[in-house]
């Protein structure tokens, strides 16, 4: 029991064992993960820079998009650098407090990601259903408060799960079969009763994911009713195209999230562990990687802004 702090049942550190059963191919698995992370960082920073520089994108919709990009960067950066160190250099040890901190940030940022998608759905709803009041409803003050409350909600709901995990006794060992510190992955190696952790995790998922999905569903129901009532086919097409990128972002976020959540709580014995670990990594990587691409392809204003940016750079180089 050398991994314990004296007589305490709190370990000094944990060992993140990577992807169980696939240790021999850790290096090969790291290449697609590293590629996706590089695309995510480049794409999201590029999108934020574009929105900051182009005055045509200084509208609530794109402010929320910049907030989504910022959240995406934080979400994937909370795990991927450490995961790559595990896969590349076999550096598996993580301090107990660092593990709890990583767990806190992972769940806070994933909760914030869901919240921002919900805010973007409300933004689309106001823009399509109440176009004349759009500018007066979504002021800079309202946007800032909404973003802050979304972050605060994640923090306040995740903090208890961190303390619930910290209180557990770890007498079975300190090896976690995962690439990062996830709430239930850490709790499951405890020799204590983790029922409270599991129930609280389910409550948080319902409070965040359930509430956000309900708001998104109501928003899109109102949008659909408003669009169907439009007399012009072009207007209907324009309204639908406005929501396409956001709908893709919702699918990319919630499908792997639900898979990861339900396999953790209900499918632990039916889903192979290595599949669960891979999906848990893709769950944090897929949205940050694909969101800039989806919004770049599907959103006309973003495409035009990219073209203007490169044309401006080309003109400046010619003048030089």
Curated annotation (Swiss-Prot):
GO MF annotations in UniProt: G protein-coupled receptor activity; olfactory receptor activity
Origin superkingdom: Eukaryota
Sequence ranges on the Extracellular membrane side: 1-27, 78-101, 163-198, 261-276
Residue stretches spanning the membrane: 28-48, 57-77, 102-122, 142-162, 199-219, 240-260, 277-297
Mode of membrane association: Multi-pass membrane protein
Organism: Homo sapiens
PROSITE patterns assigned: G_PROTEIN_RECEP_F1_2 (PS50262)
Cytoplasmic side: 49-56, 123-141, 220-239, 298-320
Gene Ontology CC annotations of this record: plasma membrane
Family: Belongs to the G-protein coupled receptor 1 family.
Lineage of producing organism: Eukaryota, Metazoa, Chordata, Craniata, Vertebrata
Protein name listed in UniProt: Olfactory receptor 52N1
Annotated function: Odorant receptor.
Subcellular compartments: Cell membrane
Keyword Membrane among UniProt keywords: yes
Glycosylated position list: 5
């Amino acid at each position: 029991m050398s991994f314990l702090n004296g007589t305490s049942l709190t370990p000094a550190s944990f060992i993140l064992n990577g992807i169980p059963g696939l240790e021999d191919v850790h290096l090969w698995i790291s290449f697609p993960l590293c590629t996706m992370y590089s695309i995510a960082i480049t794409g999201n920073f590029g999108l934020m820079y574009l929105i900051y520089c182009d005055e045509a994108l200084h509208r609530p919709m794109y402010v929320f998009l910049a907030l989504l990009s910022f959240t995406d960067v934080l979400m994937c950066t909370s795990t991927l650098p450490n995961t790559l160190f595990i896969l590349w250099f076999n550096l598996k040890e993580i301090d107990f407090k660092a593990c709890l901190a990583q767990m806190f940030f992972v769940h806070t940022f994933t909760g914030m990601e869901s919240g921002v998608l919900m805010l973007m759905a409300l933004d689309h709803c106001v823009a399509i259903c109440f176009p004349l009041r759009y500018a007066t409803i979504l002021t800079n003050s309202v946007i800032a408060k909404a973003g802050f409350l979304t972050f605060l909600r994640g923090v306040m709901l995740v903090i208890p799960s961190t303390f619930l995990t910290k209180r557990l006794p770890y007498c079975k060992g300190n090896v976690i079969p995962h690439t990062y510190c996830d709430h239930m992955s850490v709790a499951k190696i405890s020799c204590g009763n983790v029922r409270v952790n599991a129930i609280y995790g389910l409550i948080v998922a319902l409070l965040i994911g359930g509430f956000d999905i309900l708001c998104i569903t109501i928003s899109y129901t109102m949008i659909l009713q408003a669009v169907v009532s439009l007399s012009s086919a072009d207007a209907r097409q324009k309204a639908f195209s406005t929501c396409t990128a956001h709908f893709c972002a919702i699918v990319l976020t919630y499908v792997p999230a639900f898979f990861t959540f339900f396999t953790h709580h209900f499918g632990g014995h039916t889903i192979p562990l290595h599949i669960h670990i891979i999906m848990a990594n893709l769950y944090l990587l897929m949205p940050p990687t694909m969101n800039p691409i989806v919004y770049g392809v599907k959103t006309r204003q973003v495409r035009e802004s990219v073209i203007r940016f490169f044309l401006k750079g080309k003109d400046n180089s010619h003048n030089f």
